[in-house]
């Protein structure tokens, strides 16, 4: 009982309990939210009967064979590159305990299987960046590593990094990270938020893996013109310490900025999943340039298209219909358009994670995390290529590994 009172009043022995409380709080939030979708061993049963038992290439594109796909998965720490026929072209072994030193802030015994390569970035010379995320245990995220094409480690930056990364034309690396804090926020309009809690950051890292800058997302919002209107919503967010859950950082290029008068070259688009919100921040001034909500919910992978439209993976905006959507939003007119939401014989619903890629000729490459599925649609929304990753439970071939990062390339890009 005294332990419980010490937590509420922040008195002795609260400081002694702090470490375990932080871990328990972070783990509780993620596990309870996801437990109905994710199995403990990293395998999942596809959400639709149409996809159960499907393995490998299921729809072949004979009209365009210049297709290479890179993907990471939830099981074996191997990054694979396949061709248009689904044949393995190359692989990188990025096993964390074999390749990396355990970060000193990880004080728990965590299994290797829980440290997963969440996002990858492939350089033309075969080097690869990997973000290591501790699934269901964000406080134990491992960091970012760079490997060469032979899977030799080039550098490793420990840190609680997570979700997606982006790389600017100049080679700077943009990523998300968090701290687990045990004191109240000192920023304006956050007096109602009590610890333990996550504080979320944008990190800018140079090509040698050295941290150049760290920007607090909450601090930036609290000092913006959006602060009072937005931050009170955190009180109602059922996030138990994970108040924002940022899951995308996207660098706005000069070509993209030229098509949107609101944003500038070098701005960063950040998706905040817990509050169904998207922000645009100037990393030089740390000012919030734009903040908005829309007809989406639980969104991931939010980017700016070459036409200057915000485009996102809307995981839960059509949850009642059991659909996810690829959605385009114009921040100037506030008009939105659904680019894809599945077909009757090819249902599309990914409640967590997942990503997409805008391709020439209005094609879209889509990664559906839970189903272990990657596919490409044409301008008429027809599926022209489909592949289910072949990593399956040895005891049940209907259980598949999840696919995290799925990215499409042409031969000239490799």
Annotate each predicted stretch with a short phrase.
Residues 1-414:
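Histidine-/acidic-rich catalytic cores in large beta-rich domains
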